[in-house]
Amino acid sequence: MSQKWGLVHIYASYNNTILHVTDLTGAETIAKVSGGMIVRNQRDESSPYAAMQAAFKIADLMRDKGIDQVHVKVRATGGQKSKNPGPGAQAAIRALSRAGIRIGRIEDATPIPHDGTTPKRKNR
């Protein structure tokens, strides 16, 4: 059995969770699923349940393309906003491994400013 690697980008904010699968270079998109595509209510888009179902859906799409191993990049909103990933990040990673996808490395890709713009109001 051939071992084909992919790269899963998980963007987990407090409003939504987006899973995006690319090849190892990150140039070619293989599949993309968000929490909003899974649940009806807008308040549930960022929930762990929506992230888990999105991860199961993405695992099926990856298996169809022949990808069975992935590296994971987790990203929060970052910048001047929250640098902590939302509630869906951990649930998505756990669901991917439960779906039979082998996980290589997990890294944090949250953008952190090196003294960027002035924060607004209370954060100054």
From Swiss-Prot:
* Keyword Transcription regulation on entry: no
Question: What are the GO cellular component annotations?
Answer: ribonucleoprotein complex; ribosome
GO terms, molecular function: rRNA binding; structural constituent of ribosome
Keywords (A to Z) from UniProt = Ribonucleoprotein, Ribosomal protein, RNA-binding, rRNA-binding
What are the start and end residues of every segment in region (Disordered)?
A: 102-124
Family (UniProt) = Belongs to the universal ribosomal protein uS11 family.
- Tell me the function of this protein: Located on the platform of the 30S subunit.
Q: What is its quaternary makeup?
A: Part of the 30S ribosomal subunit.
The protein's name? Small ribosomal subunit protein uS11
